[in-house]
Amino acid sequence: MKTASPSKKSLSRILPHLLLALIVSIAAIEPNLAHANGGLDKVNTSMQKVLDLLSGVSITIVTIAIIWSGYKMAFRHARFMDVVPVLGGALVVGAAAEIASYLLR
């Protein structure tokens, strides 16, 4: 009489689910593992630094784009439609930094 043994294919399908169940069980038993003993504070600090950097970069890019557009219109006699792509790009960069700031706070 043969006993049923799991094949390698069925074991490879079940293994990820078993590992996930094990991780969830350990996290439920030991909630301090989920908080990583202060690791969340480190992540928040790092993300705040990234947000500050993005804000500074976006302010710089928007300022340079406005100065460049003004110079081109004043001294090179460019039409407004000639500088719209640059101003639009600056608007997108500035908005992206602010949207990221809004989403991460």
Swiss-Prot record:
Pfam short name (any one): TrbC
Residues annotated as signal peptide: 1-36
Conditions for induction: Specifically induced within macrophages by phagosome acidification. Induced at 37 degrees Celsius in minimal medium, suggesting that nutritional stress is a regulating signal.
GO cellular component, one term: plasma membrane
Transmembrane feature ranges: 50-70, 83-103
Domain of life: Bacteria
UniProt topology in membrane: Multi-pass membrane protein
Principal cellular location given in the protein's record: membrane
Keywords from the named record: Cell membrane, Membrane, Signal, Transmembrane, Transmembrane helix, Virulence
Subcellular location: Cell membrane
Comment field (misc): Transcription of the operon is maximal in early exponential phase.
Family: Belongs to the PtlA family.
Task performed by this protein: The VirB system could be required for the establishment of the replication niche in the host.
Protein name: Type IV secretion system protein virB2
